[in-house]
Amino acid sequence: MAENHPYDPNDVAACRSVLVEALTVLGKYRDRIAVVGGWVPELAIPGQGHMGSLNVDLALDVAQFPPNVYETIRSDLLAAGYTPTDIPNRFERKVPGNPTPVRVDLLCGEYAGERSGSTHEMVQGMAVWKARGLDLVVWFHTKIRVSGTLPDGGRNDVEVTIPTIPAFLCMKGILLVDRKKDKDAYDVYFCVANFPGGLKALSSDFQPMLSNNLVQEGLRNLRAKFSTIEDIGPVWAARVAVEAGADEEFARRDAFEQINRLLDLLKIPKHGQPA
């Protein structure tokens, strides 16, 4: 069964409002918190028709936080109207006029703290979800500004750290192996198709990162998942692109061709070929 993508503009606007508010509430930690996940394409390449996201993912640079900060983060979120959920690292924020609460997840990379088989990192008494590939935002990031109206009113403009587009693509490449979510493939397609300066500029931005093992893992995964026009990468990307007004057949072929041209420029072996 195809995944449903209910990206109602009101829900997206509510989520952006919560994104700006969460970054406002946690402003004193802005140098140690990054926005990751589905908002990155719209924030990094605005005005090109990306649909945004319905949840907020915040990656915490665990190594850079002094003692007792995590309890302060939790307290700050609770005081601002965020409610905890049954999932330890997840909060929700109700937005006036919108029936669906916005989800806010606190995440960290696998190498941020103690190595264990647990899905969560317990830091100063607060659970943070460990996600493979998130360490890339600590190593390869940029700063931008994002503005919006807060849920309770008033506009604000805040500085935020996001992964570079090359890092983001590798993070999504890792996720394409770990879960089934059509929008992961769409986000890859959108960033590659709309990168300022085109594929050669994007390839150039990748060059300083290519010796990194997580980068190589993500790129190899992209090669595997976009190996043919029938693979899940192009198919999932096209399903979501239709919601943005694209022709599904064109989007599927374009996603396949663009991602593979990029991977050719980066000299990533064809799927099934030795490295």
Model segments located where?
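Compositionally biased terminal segments of proteins
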Residues: 1-275
